Amino acid sequence: MKLLSKIMIIALAASMLQACNGQSGMNKQGTGTLLGGAGGALLGSQFGQGKGQLVGVGVGALLGAVLGGQIGASMDEQDRRLLELTSQRALESAPSGSNIEWRNPDNGNHGYVTPNKTYRNSAGQYCREYTQTVIIGGKQQKTYGNACRQPDGQWQVVN
């Protein structure tokens, strides 16, 4: 549980740093930075134990934030809409391990969502682990996360 608290602190710090950019609302680069940092922290937490695990969380958060910010800055509104629609479809009905693809015909950006393990959280909601892979300008980037199904049927990212 302590590790989860540390990850939440990192995510909160990232969101406060984003708030300092002076814009009302979060821009696409800020959103990418925040989500990339949280995903990187989660991935980094899988390595090591004790202080080594904390270092993994910090390094993962930093690298995830940098990569997420780059992805967010490069994705346009259509890319984000296609990714969101594909994510909802993949999480709702795709078998674990399958790649559900999207492509923006206007700019060539594309990617896929891979849903993985399905589980129930402590509140009884169905949740899934997933990987999002995007190819922007020929460069591939991956993010990892978890999403839970809401009462209205939509899937919401929980980390």
Swiss-Prot record:
Membrane topology: Lipid-anchor
Signal sequence range: 1-19
Lipidation (N-palmitoyl cysteine): C20
Highest taxon of the lineage: Bacteria
Gene coding for it: omp
PROSITE patterns in the record: PROKAR_LIPOPROTEIN (PS51257)
Organism: Rickettsia prowazekii (strain Madrid E)
One Gene Ontology term, aspect cellular component: cell outer membrane
Family membership: Belongs to the rickettsiale 17 kDa surface antigen family.
UniProtKB keywords: Cell outer membrane, Lipoprotein, Membrane, Palmitate, Signal
Locations listed in the record: Cell outer membrane
Disulfide bonds: none
Residues with a covalently attached lipid (S-diacylglycerol cysteine): C20
Pfam families in the record: 17kDa_Anti_2, Rick_17kDa_Anti
InterPro entries found in the cross-reference section: Anti_2 (IPR032635), Gly_zipper_2TM_dom (IPR008816), Surface_antigen_Rickettsia (IPR016364)
Protein name: 17 kDa surface antigen
Stretches that traverse the bilayer: none
